[in-house]
Structure formats: structure tokens, C-alpha cells
UniProtKB/Swiss-Prot annotation:
Keyword set, alphabetical order: ATP-binding, Cytoplasm, Kinase, Magnesium, Metal-binding, Nucleotide-binding, Transferase
GO molecular function terms noted in the UniProt entry: acetate kinase activity; ATP binding; magnesium ion binding
UniProt protein name: Acetate kinase
Subunit annotation: Homodimer.
Cross-referenced NCBIfam families: ackA
InterPro entries, A to Z: Ac/propionate_kinase, Aliphatic_acid_kin_short-chain, Aliphatic_acid_kinase_CS, ATPase_NBD
Residues given in the record as Mg(2+) binding sites: N8, E382
Gene symbol of the encoding locus: ackA
Binding site for substrate: R89
Organism: Bacillus anthracis
PANTHER family for this protein: ACETATE KINASE (PTHR21060), ACETATE KINASE-RELATED (PTHR21060:SF15)
Length: 397
């Protein structure tokens, strides 16, 4: 048995989960927030109880030291020697990484170089990797990329209709995101269906504050809704999803905003927040719709209609689907959104059962038994995928 830590480092946060592998038992998990501020928050679960501490954590290295100290102090590990591997979520692997990889100096340099493609995320991921290297330099560390799963997309899916030299010179193409989540739920769907993954055509709907749809054929991603960045695709909590690109200079002209300001609006003030004017949270918006709020209704209609566009086109691409999967915060917990997405899809063999659909955050088939297309709710588990890859690549036993 080996203990493996899965790490997700943000610019001012560090999310962690410690597994006993290969049993996949979660020993503890937690979150360090507001790193760099005087009132940083450190939360860890010990024996099922959440412990919370507000203290000054100036940087990620201090956060890592504090985390490791808490593991030994609470007897979760007897000594740090028990930690056999570390897995780091890295948002962007570009075309360089089609799989998770053992971190070397060269790999770390490549990840830093790819920061151009993910300026908000990759630098933070690198900081997390370096912080652990300082404290546990001899423990195998693995980078698990959000983009890697989508590297199987054909050129017809990943190329934009732009001058080809933009792709050759600047790497401008669709990359796709949420890959670790889409990989986990499609592999789990094959297990639940009792069929080989290689024989299945699956639609994976990762619906959270960020949302993406993936077409997965034979276990390989053949298309996905996010693009060069996670701004593309369906309408999201605060992100616009696809818009006419000519709108950007038009908005600049009308508002006097810079490119950076307009892109910030598209990322942080658009989507459901932009449409409603008051919230990016679907629970708030559904409650407002029930009170008769017109903009809430319109926002929900837009959200669902954009998802339908991808379901329709990806079903055509795969010449039919075996199952539709719902995952992530909204996909796992909102029966109302699932119902609206599934309504009217009988033409493609989708028959959902409203009673079975009444599930929240647990695995369930929500289709009628006679439905040719199965509908499955699967809570995602990106952390366990990270731990599995550390076990696979880290030569840990």
C-alpha cells in the first residue's frame, strides 16, 4: 500500500487529497485558501471532522509545509516517508503532453513555457510543483493535464478555420479542458454499463460553474465544446461561451474598453451572471424563475439550448450514442437542469424517468429500462484519477 497526495494549486489556493493506494481510500482532504494574505484559511478533515485555522500563510511553500506538518501531527501519516507519490493537476499541456507524465526539470520547463496558453492557471500549478519539490525532493511527482484526454481529437475537430500558419507558428487550435473529469466518468460509465469502453459512444456533460460537453468514442475524445481556452463552448456561470468574434472590436468601440477589459467581461461578468444581472449560481436562478423572473427563465433557456446544440452535433458525429453522462456540480445535483436537457430527446432514443431523476450527488441510471440510450449521473472524481496516474507512472509499490 502507498500513500499518494493529489494536489490542485491555484494562484492563491491549494486543494489536496491523500489516498491509500491502490485501494483508493481517502485518508484526508482539505483546502488552503487566501495564500499570500494575513488571514489565510487552512481546512483539513481529520476522522471525518473538519478542522479550520485562520493564520498567515505567505506563499505556497509555507502552505505545503503546514499541510505536511498537519498530516504527521494528526497521525494521518507516521512520518513523511510514507508518502510515496504526489500528483499535480496542470491545466494546460498543449500538444506536448497527450498523457500524464513524471515531472523532471525538462517537463517543468515545458509546463512553464505553456503558461502563454493558460496564464491564469499554469503559473500557479508550477508554484505548487516547486513548493513540493522543496520539501519532498525525492518523492516521485506526476503532472496530470486537463487537456491531455482531448489530444485524440482529429484535425477536423481541433483546427479553426483560420490561416493554417497560425496553428503551425502559434499553436492556435482547440485544446479542450475538463479532460480528467471526462476520462473518469466515461471509464466509470463503461463499468456501470458492463460493456468494454472501446465499444461505446458516449456524451459526457460536465456541468458546473465551468461547463463542457465531450464526445467520447471508443474511450477517446473526438470533440469537446471548450476551445483554445475554457471560455469557449456552452454558456457557463460567468463565461460567455461561443460568441461572434466580431463582437469583441464592436464592444471595444461602443464601451471604450481595452481588449483585456472585454476579455475579462467575457470571462467574469458574462454567462448566467451576465444574462440575469444578479447571479451565476443556477440554484438562485431557478428560485428566481419560480418567482416569475423573466430574465431567469431566459438565462436557463439559453443555458439548456446551448447544451442541446452540442448533444445534437456530437450525436450526429458518432452516428448515435449509447449513453449520456451528467457530472460536476450542476450535472450531479440539479434534477431540474437534467430534465430540461433531456426533454424532447426521444427522437434520438432518450427516455428519462422523472422519478429516477430525483437523485443528488450519487451514481444512478435515470432512464426508463426500455430507453435505447442510457442516462447516467456519475459524480466526478478528478483526484482519484490523479492518484491512479501517480501509481501508474511513479513506479510505486
Amino acid at each position: 500500500m502507498s500513500k499518494i497526495i493529489a494536489i490542485n494549486a491555484g494562484s492563491s489556493s491549494l486543494k489536496f487529497q491523500l489516498f491509500e493506494m491502490p485501494s483508493e481510500t481517502v485518508l484526508t482532504k482539505g483546502l488552503v485558501e487566501r495564500i499570500g494574505l494575513e488571514d489565510s484559511i487552512f481546512t483539513i478533515t481529520v476522522d471525518g471532522e473538519k478542522q479550520k485555522e485562520i493564520t498567515n500563510i505567505p506563499d505556497h511553500a509555507v502552505a505545503v509545509n503546514m499541510l505536511l506538518k498537519k498530516l504527521t501531527e494528526n497521525g494521518i501519516v507516521k512520518s513523511l516517508d510514507e508518502i510515496g507519490g504526489i500528483g499535480h493537476r496542470v491545466v494546460h499541456g498543449g500538444e506536448k503532453f497527450a498523457d500524464s507524465v513524471l515531472i523532471t526539470d525538462e517537463v517543468l520547463a515545458d509546463i512553464e513555457e505553456l503558461s502563454d496558453l493558460a496564464p491564469l492557471h499554469n503559473p500557479a500549478n508550477v508554484v505548487g510543483i516547486k513548493a513540493f519539490q522543496e520539501v519532498l525532493p525525492n518523492v516521485p511527482a506526476v503532472a496530470v493535464f486537463d487537456t491531455a484526454f482531448h489530444q485524440t481529437m482529429p484535425e477536423s475537430a481541433f483546427l479553426y478555420s483560420l490561416p493554417y500558419e497560425y496553428y503551425e507558428k502559434f499553436g492556435i487550435r482547440k485544446y479542450g479542458f475538463h479532460g480528467t473529469s471526462h476520462k473518469y466518468v466515461t471509464e466509470r460509465a463503461a463499468e456501470l454499463l458492463g460493456r468494454p469502453l472501446e465499444s461505446l459512444s458516449l456524451l459526457s456533460c460536465h456541468l458546473g460553474n465551468g461547463a463542457s460537453i465531450a464526445a467520447v468514442e471508443g474511450g477517446k475524445s473526438i470533440d469537446t465544446s471548450m476551445g483554445f481556452t475554457p471560455l469557449a463552448g456552452v454558456t457557463m456561470g460567468t463565461r460567455s461561451g461561443n460568441i461572434d468574434p466580431a463582437l469583441i472590436p464592436y464592444i471595444m468601440e461602443k464601451t471604450g474598453q481595452t481588449v483585456e477589459e472585454v476579455v475579462s467581461v467575457l470571462n467574469k461578468k458574462s454567462g448566467m451572471l451576465g444574462l440575469t444581472g444578479y447571479s451565476s449560481d443556477l440554484r438562485d436562478i431557478i428560485a428566481k424563475e419560480e418567482e416569475g423572473d423573466h430574465r431567469a427563465k431566459v438565462a436557463l433557456d439559453v443555458f439548456v439550448s446551448r447544451i442541446h446544440k452540442y448533444i445534437g452535433s456530437y450525436t450526429a458525429r458518432m452516428k448515435g450514442v449509447d449513453a449520456i453522462i451528467f457530472t460536476a456540480g450542476v450535472g450531479e445535483n440539479s434534477a431540474i437542469i437534467r430534465e430540461r436537457v433531456l426533454e424532447g430527446l426521444e427522437y434520438m432514443g432518450v427516455y428519462f424517468d422523472a422519478k429516477r431523476n430525483n437523485v443528488f450527488g450519487e451514481e444512478a441510471f435515470i432512464n426508463f429500462p426500455h430507453s435505447p440510450v442510457k442516462i447516467i449521473v456519475i459524480p466526478t472524481d478528478e483526484e482519484v484519477m490523479i492518484a491512479r496516474d501517480v501509481l501508474r507512472l511513479g513506479n510505486i509499490g
